[in-house]
């Protein structure tokens, strides 16, 4: 006769002991996952703070490098355009008469403007003389036209020297010429045009390449709208000029190593 087996009796755990067991064994199984979650959370928080600090430092550095001086005269906004630079144009043509006519037609005083005194102060423009015929307006010369003036002075001196003209120059003229060289150098360094110019080992470099430029027509329009009506011949209050005399430069035959191409 088969012997009946009695089920084994499991010991009854005290509720407190059951809780202790769960605490010991159950929590030990969950602990790795909890630690991973905590680690990942701390890692995300750390990265967020780090990237935030880097962004703040970068922004602060950019703002510091672009800090505008309080005495910076805010210039009028002039549109940007792309133009080709040519090695030889009408302004450097081998036709000397054409060269002279073009250069002598330039009216640098077209860049003399008159604007409202109060408005100029709002743009941080420096104090200046008043327009004789209208004391409410302040007189300024646009930088680009000052450079045009200096180029004219230097070219006139070069032409006279090449022609063997006998002339004696005053100390003021010497100082003016030195100033123009200096001014053009400062302007060139200020613009720091980094356009890479092609070269094949000859004299000519970069002819026909595109450059990023300010729109001269837009600058001329601004000068027209705010003209001080100043000319070298009649001074202020004279007849306003019909323009600055500049014409668009177009490519012409080019001289390479002593030969016209």
UniProtKB/Swiss-Prot annotation:
Glycoprotein among keywords: yes
InterPro entries: UstYa-like (IPR021765)
PANTHER family the record matches: OXIDASE USTYA (PTHR33365:SF6), YALI0B05434P (PTHR33365)
UniProt-recorded Gene Ontology molecular function terms: oxidoreductase activity
Protein location: Membrane
EC number: 1.-.-.-
Keyword Amino-acid biosynthesis: no
Motif (HXXHC 1): 146-150
Keywords: Glycoprotein, Membrane, Oxidoreductase, Transmembrane, Transmembrane helix
Sites carrying sugar chains: 95
A Gene Ontology biological process term: mycotoxin biosynthetic process
Family indicated by similarity: Belongs to the ustYa family.
Protein name: Hydroxylase cctR
Role this protein plays: Hydroxylase; part of the gene cluster that mediates the biosynthesis of the mycotoxin cyclochlorotine, a hepatotoxic and carcinogenic cyclic chlorinated pentapeptide. Within the pathway, cctR performs the last step by hydroxylating cyclochlorotine to yield hydroxycyclochlorotine. The NRPS cctN initially catalyzes the condensation of L-serine (Ser), Pro, L-2-aminobutyrate (2Abu), Ser, and beta-Phe in this order to produce isocyclotine.
Record organism: Talaromyces islandicus
This protein's domain notes: The 2 HXXHC motifs are conserved in ustYa family proteins and might form active sites.
Membrane topology: Single-pass membrane protein
Assigned GO CC terms: membrane
Transmembrane segments: 38-58
Gene inactivation effect: Abolishes the production of hydroxycyclochlorotine.
HXXHC 2, short sequence motif: residues: 176-180
Pathway assigned in UniProt: Mycotoxin biosynthesis
């Amino acid at each position: 006769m088969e012997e009946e087996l009695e089920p084994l009796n499991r010991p009854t755990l005290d509720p407190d002991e059951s809780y202790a067991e769960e605490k010991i064994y159950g929590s030990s199984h969950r602990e790795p996952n909890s630690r991973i979650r905590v680690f990942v959370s701390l890692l995300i928080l750390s990265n967020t703070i780090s990237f935030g600090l880097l962004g703040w430092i970068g922004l602060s550095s950019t703002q510091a490098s672009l800090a505008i001086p309080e005495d910076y005269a805010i210039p009028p906004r002039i549109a940007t355009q792309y133009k080709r630079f040519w090695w030889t144009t009408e302004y450097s043509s081998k036709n000397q008469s054409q060269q002279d006519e073009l250069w002598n037609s330039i009216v640098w005083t077209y860049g003399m403007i008159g604007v409202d005194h109060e408005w100029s102060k709002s743009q941080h423009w420096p104090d200046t003389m008043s327009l004789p015929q209208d004391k409410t307006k302040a007189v300024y010369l646009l930088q680009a036209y000052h450079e045009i003036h200096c180029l004219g002075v230097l070219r006139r001196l070069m032409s006279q020297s090449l022609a063997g003209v006998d002339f004696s120059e005053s100390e003021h003229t010497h100082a003016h010429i030195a100033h123009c060289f200096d001014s053009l150098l400062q302007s060139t360094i200020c613009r720091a045009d980094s356009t890479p110019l092609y070269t094949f080992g000859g004299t000519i470099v970069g002819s026909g390449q595109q450059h990023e430029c300010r729109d001269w027509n837009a600058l001329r329009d601004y000068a027209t709208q705010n003209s001080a009506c100043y000319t070298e011949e009649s001074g202020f209050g004279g007849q306003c000029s019909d323009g600055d005399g500049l014409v668009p430069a177009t490519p012409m035959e080019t001289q390479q190593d002593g030969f016209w191409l």
